[in-house]
A protein has these predicted regions:
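His/Asp/Glu-rich mid-to-C-terminal helical/loop segments that flank catalytic regions of hydrolases
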Residues: 382, 497, 502-570
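Metal-dependent peptidase/peptidase-like ectodomains
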Residues: 139, 248-283, 400-505, 511-512, ...
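C-terminal motif of bacterial Sec signal peptides marking the signal peptidase cleavage site
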Residues: 23-26
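A conserved hydrophobic secondary-structure block that centers on an alpha-helix together
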Residues: 162-235
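Soluble metallo-hydrolase cores and metallopeptidase-like ectodomains found primarily
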Residues: 127-129, 139-177, 255-366, 379-382, ...
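Noncatalytic luminal/extracellular "stalk/propeptide" segments of secretory-pathway proteins
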Residues: 72-192, 314, 318-319
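N-terminal hydrophobic or amphipathic helices/low-complexity stretches enriched
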Residues: 30-101, 273, 335
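Acidic/histidine-rich catalytic neighborhood of metal-dependent amide-processing enzymes
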Residues: 204-208, 212, 229, 348-354, ...
Length: 574
């Protein structure tokens, strides 16, 4: 997955990558076997299950191929990702789908800007009462890559603005009584716990937070980590990968989309160094951390000034979504499209991590996240292509780029679809299904927002699978994967995840999820050698296909529920 997913570690991040050589055969069964791994396989609790039928074997083969070291982690904008995209395009062709990308190909170009921070010239200094406190790069702070300028150096007064949330419909304003114009905002992440999950998700999003800060006149931003932030993602993990590039969509003018140029510098400070930022202020970092937990944060002006400086290497790069189409069978409805998605990219090559065998690995292969999701997407496409008659509405199958960079491939597709925008009726997304213990259920995320709930329930009965509620609703993963780009475009969407109820009373899917998040998520050990339970992967593909079939054949297109927060904010015409 991509941007911050919490839990004991459910967080998308961002890392680098690059390579592979030989051409891939067009036929799935002719695809070359994965090369021998360059490092020892990660330790696992049980032996990886052996695929028991053709469907399980197809999914296993796709996962093992896409998660092989030859693809070097499939980072967006690298040769390794492009070779993975070539593989998926050949699989789409072998299934019998039509190309639906640019110029009659399977590929939709996605223009990106890549920004990489440089250690030289980076500074964060606190000027208080005639003394300067210089924070240490990497250990105490990291500058954010600047998409607007190769170099910045600014000094200004600072204001603590709580979590930087302005939610007038909830009577909440962190900016009340504060003058942020021409100043540097010091801010915590997240949103008040009293907000419902939907609004907390929306106002926690980095894009909305930066927009609010820019609108209130901030010229710089210092994000201060809390202990809760670092319980989910330790500062050392962030600091070890400081050279990872970040990306934004590149507009027609060559500039980054949503880069907020009025904010001229940004940095993040570790929780351990927070007291340096708040030195000589009216409240200590510990007091503010407690206030954040209690929902009682109040902003204030800080004494003295802050200085932010950084250098960034900015360069244009290109990546590709892989897009295929299954034509609908009804003359009146075939122009409408159900969009299936799974992100193809992962984290590439990053900081080496020592495995349980003592050996280091730098390739973040992303077997669960999200080679497995792409393999399920391919099996879904194969299932629907084999059905006769075809669904009445058409189906689009999209392997997306740059999810790990902030849902960029999905955002580009949702705003630049190969068909008229109004022709997209629903999005069905799969991302990081942690299928490491047999379950009797599936967790559908986001079903409460639209009429897709009834469709999903009927499809689940068709397949014979139980549905369970989101086990971690406070983590609002509904806005943390590619479906959110479609939601922002006004398109009802759901996201299918693995189940949480044990099928055999022995192996616990919840425990397996927590272990994966703790030990393997966004680490090199997310390998195809993990004990993926292939029958659950096949079942998820069947359910995915049945949902799409029911949406495809329905008399009415899906609609947002009356009064829904996301429908009200993003539905077409808003």
């Amino acid at each position: 997955m991509a941007f911050p997913k919490s839990l004991p570690a459910r967080l998308p991040t961002i890392l680098p990558a690059a390579a592979l050589a030989a051409a891939l055969a067009a036929c799935h069964r002719e695809a070359p076997a994965p090369s021998a791994p360059t490092v020892a396989a990660p330790a696992i609790d049980t032996a990886a299950p052996i695929p028991a039928n053709d469907a399980e074997q197809r999914i296993a083969d796709d996962v093992r191929t896409l998660a092989d070291d030859r693809f070097e982690g499939r980072e967006a904008g690298t040769r390794g990702y492009d070779l993975a995209a070539d593989y998926v395009a050949k699989r789409f062709a072998a299934i019998g789908l039509a190309p639906a990308g640019d110029d009659g190909t399977f590929f939709q170009a996605v223009p990106l800007l890549k920004a990489t921070r440089e250690a030289d010239g980076a500074a964060l200094a606190v000027e208080r009462n005639g003394r300067e406190i210089a924070l240490r790069f990497g250990e105490q702070f990291l500058p954010a890559p600047d998409f607007n300028a190769a170099e910045h150096d600014l000094e200004a007064p600072a204001v603590f603005v709580g979590q930087g949330v302005h939610a007038p419909e909830l009577g909440h304003d962190d900016f009340a009584g504060l003058d942020l114009r021409g100043k540097i905002a010091v801010v915590f992440g997240g949103a008040p716990a009293r907000f419902d999950n939907d609004r907390r998700a929306f106002y926690s999003a980095k894009r909305e937070k930066l927009r609010a800060l820019a609108e209130h006149g901030a010229i710089g931003v210092v994000m201060v980590n809390t202990p809760q932030d670092e319980a989910e993602r330790p500062w050392t993990q962030t600091a070890d990968n400081w050279q990872r590039p970040e990306m934004r969509l590149r507009g027609a003018d060559g500039k980054a989309v949503d880069s907020f140029p009025s904010i001229r510098g940004m940095a993040t400070v570790s929780a351990a160094a927070a007291d340096l930022v708040f030195a000589d202020g009216p409240r200590t970092a510990a007091q503010l951390f407690d206030a954040a937990q209690a929902g009682a944060l109040q902003g204030f002006a800080l004494p003295g000034t802050l200085r932010l400086a950084a250098r960034t290497k900015i360069e244009p790069v290109a990546s590709r979504n892989v897009v295929a189409r299954l034509a609908g069978g009804d003359a009146a409805l075939a122009a409408q499209h159900v969009v299936y998605t799974a992100h193809l990219d992962h984290l590439g090559i990053g900081a080496p991590v020592k495995g349980e065998d003592g050996r280091e690995d730098r390739i973040y292969n992303g077997a669960i996240d999200n080679a497995l999701g792409v393999a399920i997407l391919l099996e879904t496409a194969r299932t629907l292509k084999a059905e006769s008659p075809a669904p009445k509405r058409s189906m689009l199958f999209v392997a997306l780029t740059a999810e790990e960079k902030g849902l960029l491939g999905a955002e580009w597709f949702a705003t630049h679809p190969p068909v008229p925008a109004d022709a997209l009726v629903a999005n069905l997304n799969i991302d990081m299904p942690v299928l490491l213990a047999p379950s009797k259920d599936v967790v559908p995320i986001g079903v409460e927002h639209s009429s897709l709930k009834a469709t999903l329930e009927a499809a689940a009965k068709d397949v014979g699978v139980a549905l369970s509620p989101d086990p971690f609703p406070e983590e609002v993963v509904f806005v943390r994967s590619d479906q959110y780009a479609f939601i922002r475009a006004g398109i009802p969407a759901i996201y299918l995840d693995g189940g949480t109820e044990s099928a055999d009373g022995v192996r616990d899917p919840k425990l397996a999820l927590r272990k994966f998040l703790r030990d393997h998520y966004h680490r090199p050990s997310d390998e195809a050698t993990l004990p993926i339970y292939w029958p659950d992967a096949v079942r998820l593909a069947k359910l995915n296909a049945r949902i799409g079939r029911r949406v495809g054949d329905a008399a009415e297109r899906p609609r947002w529920n009356d009064g829904d927060f996301f429908g009200g904010k993003f539905s077409r015409g808003k």
